[in-house]
Amino acid sequence: MNAYERITRNTAEVVTEEEVRELAEDPEGKRVYVGYEPSGVLHLGHLLTANKLMDLQDAGMEVVVLLADVHAYLNDKGSFEEIRATADQMKAQFLAYGLDEDQTEFVLGSSFQLDEDYELDLHAMQVETSLKRAQRAMAEIQSGETPKVSHVVYPLMQALDIEYLDLDLAIGGMDQRKVHMLAREELPSVGYEKRPVLHTPIIGDLGSGDGKMSSSEGVTISMEDSTADIEEKVTGAFCPQTRDPEGETVNPVLELFQYHVFPRFDEVVVQRPDEYGGDLVYESYEDLADDLESGELHPADAKGALAAALDELIEPGRQRLREIRGE
C-alpha cells in the first residue's frame, strides 16, 4: 500500500484528488487535524475518524486533535467548565484507543480562538460570507431545531481553525462536508490558502440501517458500554445478507467490519461449532462480505465476531474512563 492509498483508504470523498496526491508525495511531517466537540464519551462515530488519523500517522503525518471547547459552548453543549472536563476525558480515551502520543498534538480551541488576530479574521469572514451560506454549512451539525446567531459563527470558526493550526489537510465525517466546502471557498477571501480535505463515511444506525449511527438517537456503541452491552447491541443489529439493501438503507454490521475492524486487525476469526463447518478466518473485508452474501457466513456468526472485535478495540478506552471516574 503506497502513501496515497493509505491516506485515502476507507474515505467517502477526497477533495481534491490532485491536491492529496501532491501531499502524499512527501507526507512526512505534514499536519492533519480533526476537530471534536467535547460533548460526551467517545463512540464509534469519533473512532471512525480516529482510525483515519492512525492511518495518517502510519504515513508519517503529524496529527492535531482540536478539542473544540468554544465550538461546543456555541452549540449549547454545556458550561465551559463542564466542556473542558469532558475534553480531558476525551484526550485520555483517544490515547488509550491507539493514537500515538508522540505524533499527536491536542489543542484546546480557547487557547487561540479568543486571540485578537483570530477575532479580527473571524469578523472579516463574517463580512465576506452570506447568512444563507453559513446556515447551510451548519444545518447538519447544529444542536436543537432553533437556529441561533452562534450557529452562524460556528462554521466560520472551523474554517479559520484550518489556518491558525497551520494545517496541510483537514479530516471530518461527511456531515462536515458543507463546512469544509465553505472553508475552501472563503479562506482565500481573507487572504489564506484553501487546504485539501478527506471525508469519512457516516455509518448507518445499528438497529435499522437507516440514517446515521448517533449518540442521541437510535443505537450506537461507546466506551461506556460493557462487554454485555456491546454483545446485546450487536446481536440486535440490522444485518441482511447483502452489502446493498434496498433504497438508502445500509448494512451497519458490514460497515463496522469495513471501517472499524479490518483497519485494526490482521485477521478476523469467526467462531463456529464443528457441526456448522468450524471456524472461518478472514484477512480482508471483501472475503467476509462475499461469504455473507453467498450464505457461507450466517449473520448471527458475523455478529458474534463483530461484537468480540469491537469489545477488544474499546476495552483500553473503557478501562481508562473507569479510572478517570474512580470506578
Swiss-Prot record:
MF terms (GO), sorted A to Z: ATP binding; tyrosine-tRNA ligase activity
Motif stretch ('KMSKS' region): 212-216
Protein residues bound to L-tyrosine: Y33, Y154, Q158, D161, Q176
Disulfide bonds: none
GO BP of this protein: tyrosyl-tRNA aminoacylation
GO CC term, one of those recorded: cytoplasm
Binding site for ATP: S215
This enzyme's EC code(s): 6.1.1.1
This protein's record includes keyword Cell membrane: no
InterPro entries in the record: aa-tRNA-synth_I_CS, aa-tRNA-synth_Ic, Rossmann-like_a/b/a_fold, Tyr-tRNA-ligase, Tyr-tRNA-ligase_3, Tyr-tRNA-ligase_arc/euk-type, Tyr-tRNA_synthase
Annotated localization: Cytoplasm
Segments carrying motif 'HIGH' region: 38-46
Keywords on record: Aminoacyl-tRNA synthetase, ATP-binding, Cytoplasm, Ligase, Nucleotide-binding, Protein biosynthesis
Catalytic activity: tRNA(Tyr) + L-tyrosine + ATP = L-tyrosyl-tRNA(Tyr) + AMP + diphosphate + H(+)
Keyword Glycoprotein: no
Family named by the database record: Belongs to the class-I aminoacyl-tRNA synthetase family. TyrS type 3 subfamily.
Function: Catalyzes the attachment of tyrosine to tRNA(Tyr) in a two-step reaction: tyrosine is first activated by ATP to form Tyr-AMP and then transferred to the acceptor end of tRNA(Tyr).
Matching HAMAP family: Tyr_tRNA_synth_type3
Quaternary data: Homodimer.
Protein name: Tyrosine--tRNA ligase
Organism: Halobacterium salinarum (strain ATCC 700922 / JCM 11081 / NRC-1)
